[in-house]
């Protein structure tokens, strides 16, 4: 099993780790700041450094037995037991964090609309919603500006799975359900807990910024009809 350091600290840019396995299937570390591809968020890229050597990591994916596989494009691999420094491609990761949090804000701007699909990218992202009528682009952009300017804090907490059973409305996605079986779930909260200050709360295992101001400007690229009640909203990070 690989300890997922990003679950408790998404701002971590690098970390020391020990190699458990390294072969053609990937490099497995005992702990990592690299996010493994899942839930529509791409896996991280970066480098592993050790003893004057470097392995370029082009993708990170989930392996068996809760392992995370760091896929290297270089032939030289660190031997098991080697101490490495795992360093993220931070500009790319930070863009993905900004995008992911922006998509949670988008959910908050469309209360009650279930998410039917989505994809997160460093340059462009989108969510599909079960909506009878498309929202107005200007209204969404105004909503983004207000929420981002407010610098709402983003926090995470671990709760018992029973919380989800008693609050099924926390899950906004129809196509993907939060992983179950460990007995606990990670919630991502935007805003404060008191009534009127909570912006969004939903199960999520992805990486996020520390507050909404860190997102920066968001552009609504387009809103498309993808079926009788399916509306696709595409976003991009602004300058």
Q: How would you label these PLM feature ranges?
A:
Residues 1-239:
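Active-/binding-site microenvironments in catalytic and ligand-binding cores
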